[in-house]
Amino acid sequence: ISKYKLFVSDTGLFVTMVFWDKDFAENIIYQKLLADKLEANLGYIYENLMAQMLTAAGNRLFYYTFEKDEKHSYEVDFLLSRGNKICPIEVKSSGYKSHTSLDAFRAKYSSRIKNSYLFYTKDFMVGDNEMIYIPFYMAGLI
């Protein structure tokens, strides 16, 4: 194993730990987070949330990267096993229309994929490309 990800089993505790700078967090960051007005990239929090929810639903989680070019690589946030097929998952805190890594993975391994999921903050839909877009709160249903 050359790369791995670690997740905290309690996302609420994780958020508190990430933003725990008493003078700043309690007064500004934490209030903005609670009001859903934080401008920061919250991808790592959403990924942790998904890891917690998918694991609670009984899924074994896998992570995958593959080379894009000499200096860059693609990253698939999660892979789920479904029989002899896999389900790649991308987690988006914003900008859900861009999913380059997931598209590259789907093109490379199309015969091995059952369903492709993108979790995001909007409503459920099935895209033109047969990608399934799912709101975060439905993670336990896949």
Residue ranges of model-derived segments:
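Active-site-adjacent loop/helix micro-motif of nuclease/hydrolase catalytic cores
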Residues: 95-104
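Domain-level recognition of nuclease-like catalytic cores that cleave nucleotide substrates
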Residues: 121-142
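Switch/connector loops and helix/strand junctions flanking conserved nucleotide-binding motifs
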Residues: 16, 99, 125-129
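Residues at the starts of beta-strands that form the adenosine-phosphate
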Residues: 60, 114-115
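Hydrophobic/aromatic beta-strand patches that form the interior of the parallel beta-sheet core
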Residues: 7, 89, 117-119, 132
